[in-house]
Amino acid sequence: TPGTGLLASLDEAITSAAQLGYPVMLKSTAGGGGIGLTRCDDEAGLVEAFDTVKRLGQNFFSDSGVFLERFVDNARHVEVQIFGDGLGNVLALGERDCSLQRRNQKVVEETPAPDLPAATREKLMAASVELGKAVNYRSAGTGEYIYDAHRDVFYFLEVNTRLQVEHPITEACTSIDLVEWMILTAAGQPPALDIEINPQGAAIEVRLYAEDPVRDFQPSP
């Protein structure tokens, strides 16, 4: 998400936060484990937290540097399935919404992503194809993004360079066998990617988790 470099003073932090728009996250540049990480909903909250976060960074990590990032309320996790042949051709096969999560793990995945504007969907596809082409991507991969529905903008998270558990819902709506494509590509016979993708219908995948209620719902085999 949009953010700043290291902040030299509280005044600079206040000016930068106003430009980013509240809420913002004040972060210690050397932080870890949530130490030196504070949400600020307004200028008063930023003023109150600034010296504390700097002090935590210095005490725990010998580095008092801090910076700001925009905080996205009710952020959605949207990802795009791509496939590249390693020859410069990349195809986007639609998006998946993976926003319903528990313990930072995806629980419900669905395609198409609900309430995603058509223009935003097109931008997501184009950005993912451009990303794949930039690295001459080969095989299946997933571009992952944070989507801010309030501002109707998305921010890049990462690329998962493998076939993900939720890939069958994309297969169900495109009638494309991604595993077959991966095998063909590995065998030196990549599929033609100059095709038009028009996903049909909708699909949902749900993961089942076993948890132990006696042990604070820790994962249980």
Model region roles, listed by residue range:
Residues 1-29, 36:
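A conserved helix-loop-beta module that forms one wall/lid of the active-site cleft
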Residues 28, 33, 41-221:
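ATP-dependent carboxylate activation and anion-phosphoryl transfer catalytic cores
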